[in-house]
């Protein structure tokens, strides 16, 4: 399997295993159940606690992630034993030409919403110590870049929350004298 580097062209990889099929009655097709599973990791991005408002995201990239691998199907109905191996070919995965506003509440998903075709479908892999980074660019020329840690597991969704050290949030506190009782 090879993941597309243009996120809008990526496809999810679904697999299904029937387990052992028993042909016990001659002339009668055996029953075969299939339980489908996602073999990739879905990646989304959301508003973090300190992301500047009034900005527009123009580009999101995942850099240095492995793009190729061999997927071995399970021979069990529950999918145990399926695995990824021989991962190779570090590439940059790009989502360009965006106009996604940051004027949303914390935790609001920015990419990967139903119908937007902005979900990154990545091969499951170890991230810690592999120099895999996320790069986000805004129309004003500012950017966020961060090194990823942990791992991506098959059949899961990872949502990364975007925050900045210094945001454009302005806080105003107004006080009033307490009323006498």
Locate each region found by the language model.
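A short, solvent-exposed beta-strand micro-motif common in secreted/extracellular proteins
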Residues: 127-139
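Cell-envelope/extracellular anchoring and linker segments
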Residues: 3-23, 51-107, 147-148
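Short, low-hydrophobicity acidic/polar segments
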Residues: 1-56, 106-112, 158-162, 169-181
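Exposed regions on extracellular, virion, or secretory-pathway luminal proteins
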Residues: 80, 88, 102-105, 113-114, ...
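Residue-level recognition of well-ordered beta-strand positions that form the cores
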Residues: 46-48, 61-63, 135-137
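Short Pro-Gly-centered beta-turn/loop motif in secreted/extracellular proteins
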Residues: 116-129
């Amino acid at each position: 399997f090879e993941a597309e580097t243009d996120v809008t062209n990526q496809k999810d990889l679904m697999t299904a295993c029937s387990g052992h099929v028993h042909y016990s009655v001659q002339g009668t097709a055996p029953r075969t159940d299939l339980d489908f599973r996602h073999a990739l990791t879905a990646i989304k991005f959301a508003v973090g606690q300190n992301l500047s408002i009034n900005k527009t995201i123009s580009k999101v990239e995942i850099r240095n992630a492995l793009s190729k691998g061999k997927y071995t199907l399970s021979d069990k109905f529950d999918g145990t034993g399926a695995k990824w191996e021989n991962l190779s070919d570090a590439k940059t995965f790009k989502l360009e030409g965006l106009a996604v506003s940051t004027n949303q509440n914390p935790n609001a998903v920015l990419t990967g919403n139903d119908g937007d075709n902005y979900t990154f479908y990545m091969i499951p892999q170890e991230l810690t110590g592999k120099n895999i980074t996320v790069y986000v660019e805004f129309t004003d020329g500012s950017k966020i870049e961060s090194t990823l840690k942990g791992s991506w597991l098959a059949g899961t969704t990872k949502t990364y929350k975007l925050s900045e050290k210094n945001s454009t949030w302005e806080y105003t506190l107004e006080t009033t004298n307490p009323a006498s009782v």
